[in-house]
Amino acid sequence: TARAAEPELGRIDAIAGDGDHGQGMTLGTTAAAKSARESLAAKAGARTLLSRAGAAWSEGAGGTSGALWGGALAAAGGVFSDETAPTQEEIITAAIAGANSITDMGGAKVGDKTMVDALVPFADSLKENISSSKSLKEIWNTAAKAAQTAAEATANITARKGRARTHGDASLGTPDPGAISFALLMQAIADFLQ
């Protein structure tokens, strides 16, 4: 998903940034996936797997978004045990913990034209449905759609955080690449879930 979206993410990032967001996302997701495969092969539990994947993402992608995504995976992993398979409620709680770590570390708020503009509606949707009788796939898919809608709406916002803030209104009419990549990855997870 990140690899397929890399050119478009780079293009929209170049409008009011350095144009490397797509590359960073590809490097981060590739490193995290490799680490996760290695952890699975070593029979690591969910906590260890996500902690290692987070460290790999952070190191592989570098930059601010690498640190944010890496921290989010580590925070999500902290919800799990290495001894038992995660429950649906634990998976949702872990995703919310990951989202909270991004807002805590990055300091961005909704309306700043960042990943947070997609992340908060995603997490809010998960919170609303955590006790639902719906399947994890249904709950996650609804949250991913909320993230996508919010990510697209960032085209109407002037950036107040990150590198894009120094470019004034240059990014108006273009969505935030971090919000778009967040929504893409959450939809990829929804598509993967059973």
Residue positions per predicted region:
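N-terminal loops that bind phosphate or other acidic moieties
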Residues: 1-194
